[in-house]
């Protein structure tokens, strides 16, 4: 994926699109624009189910964390489309810590259109450390866990989401991710 984005010279930050852009609400799409500053493609442009969008130029991919998001919903016995951010904030720790044992701790804080997530002792920590070498993935599309949370956020809010920043602590124990909820 990193090589594809690099070879096609796509420079924009990945945008996770909400379910209204898809025919199947359980699917997901992440849009990577050709240029750094760009607008979000129309619902019509995305629903054509093509890999490349023409207006604006970009690539439409299945998010790496989509299956994990669907597993989160299954574990909770809910559909994130029928929830909201406070519900997600309350239940994501239960899923990741108790149900799936993916992390030792998860904190989710909302500040306006910013969602900050802090994950401690994740089973993905080594993966995150390695993926930092993949500049087109780290901090844009994200690892499967960061991507899964972005998919859950876009379902719960009904709005596009970007991963603004992700960091892993020096001791490799804590992953901090900042998501932005976009207006269309």
Q: What kind of feature is each model-predicted range?
A:
Residues 1-71:
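N-terminal topogenic membrane-targeting module
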Residues 36, 111-115, 173:
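Beta-strand-connecting loop/turn residues
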Residues 52-66, 89-131:
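An N-terminal amphipathic alpha-helical segment
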Residues 72-77:
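Acidic/polar low-complexity scaffolding segments in large eukaryotic proteins
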Residues 81-86, 140-144:
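Short, surface-exposed ligand-recognition loops at beta-strand->loop->(often short) alpha-helix junctions
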Residues 116-117, 160-184:
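Short terminal or interdomain "cap/linker" segment that borders an active site or interface and mediates
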Residues 120-168:
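Short, hydrophobic/π-rich interface segment
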């Amino acid at each position: 994926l990193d090589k594809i984005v690099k070879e096609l010279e796509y420079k924009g930050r990945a945008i996770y699109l909400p379910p209204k852009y898809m025919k199947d609400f359980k699917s997901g799409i992440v849009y990577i624009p050709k240029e750094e500053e760009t607008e979000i493609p129309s619902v019509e442009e995305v629903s054509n189910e093509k890999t490349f969008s023409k207006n604006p130029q970009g690539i439409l991919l299945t998010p790496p964390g989509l299956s994990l998001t669907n597993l989160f919903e299954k574990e909770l016995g809910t559909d994130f489309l029928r929830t909201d951010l406070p519900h997600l904030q309350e239940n994501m720790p239960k899923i990741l810590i108790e149900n799936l044992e993916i992390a030792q701790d998860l904190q989710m804080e909302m500040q306006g259109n910013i969602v900050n997530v802090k994950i401690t002792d994740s089973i993905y920590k080594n993966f995150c450390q390695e993926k930092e070498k993949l500049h087109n993935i780290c901090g844009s599309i994200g690892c499967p866990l960061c991507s899964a949370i972005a998919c859950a956020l876009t379902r719960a809010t009904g709005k596009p989401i970007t991963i603004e920043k992700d960091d892993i602590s020096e001791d490799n124990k804590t992953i901090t991710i900042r998501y932005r909820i976009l207006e269309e």
